[in-house]
Amino acid sequence: MNRGDLMEAFGVSVNQASTDLNRYVSVAPANIAYDKSARAYVRGPNFSPLFLTHDASRYLAQLRSVADGILDKADAWIGQLPEFDAAPTPVRGVDAKILRAVVAAIRRRESIEIKYQSLSRPEPRWRWIAPHAIGFDGFRWHTRAFCEIDQIFKDFVMSRIMETRGTRPRTSDPGSDVDWNEHVVLEIGPHPQLSETQQKVIALDYGMRAGKAKIKVRRAFLYYALNWSP
């Protein structure tokens, strides 16, 4: 890394790039060393992050966001992206107007009338819901809402909302949505019928300790968590 890299990445001047490099060297001298042959600063042998913690998931999430087209390469904080790709998944189309209307209803604490296509009915149906949150089950986006027809809190798949129209003040209290507000802890482990080697591999895959991993999940997401499979 040299001044030119900082100037390109952050759009700063030559003087500012020099100042930033010198400041970093002063606060973390063991993290960086100047390589005369490369005319650049390189990672020190005893490097230890000063401003960020070791978190592989953040790095990999950036790669996934770029692969999915959510994040432009120029906007990623990874300086040099490695060669990468991701297996495509079917697009779950959420209409921007629908999303905007639902989010507005959440912010304004309103009920909103939606035209919703459920799996249990052959034709879409207009209904009033009082959305208070948005959730993702790993594949689909939902809005968590009080259904004024069924008189219960439930999930509505965003891509199945075909239209919206009127709004009105909501009368339900999100605080009474027990399944959304309460969490449970799932304890998972390798299937006992797997071989010892296979169990060790599964434990590595999921970061298990002593053959177990604990996952905190909202009760509302319990069904999705239990039915998820890699």
Please give the residue ranges for each predicted region.
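Polybasic (Lys/Arg-rich)
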Residues: 181-230
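Conserved short hydrophobic interaction patches
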Residues: 24-27, 164, 228
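Bulky hydrophobic/aromatic content
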Residues: 43-117, 228
